[in-house]
Amino acid sequence: GGVWNLIQTLTSDGSDDDLSFTSGIDSTYDEYVFKFINIHAETSAQTLGFQVNASGESGYNETMTTTDFRAYHAEADDGAGLSYKTDMDQAQGTAFQALMEEMNNNNDDSCSGTLHLFAPSDTTFVKHFFSRFSAEYVTDTFVAGYINTTDAITDVQFKMSSGEIQGGSISMYGI
């Protein structure tokens, strides 16, 4: 890989509905990496997700096709396995794509992970991505897919399925 160049870090002040990167995504880099450190949910049973805007668009509702699977081992040792998450993938959907599910809000609960977005400024091809996350449930979640637009992607937003992001930071790097 190339040199990681930090572009921007967003840190939750404890009351964020979302964390949005609305500048810094351009043709300078062919790959953008988002690093999530100790993202904490306001309420239990939340899903951290993302969506994007194409150039000139709003609403964070671009069309995606995705996959989602996980290896898990419950903290209480009451469940373990490997599973494909049919309720978390999309087939040409416009919802926020789940990156980490079943997040809780206990004081020691958080998730950390990485999202890779490839060639977001390319105007010929769709935009590919993949992510890997871990959380207190001892879940290793893998998500991959593509954003079905040939328009440049200029904005990326992260939010919980309900409630606020209560802590943590997301850093965006160009590679």
What kind of region is each of these model predictions?
Residues 1-175:
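Surface-exposed molecular-recognition determinants
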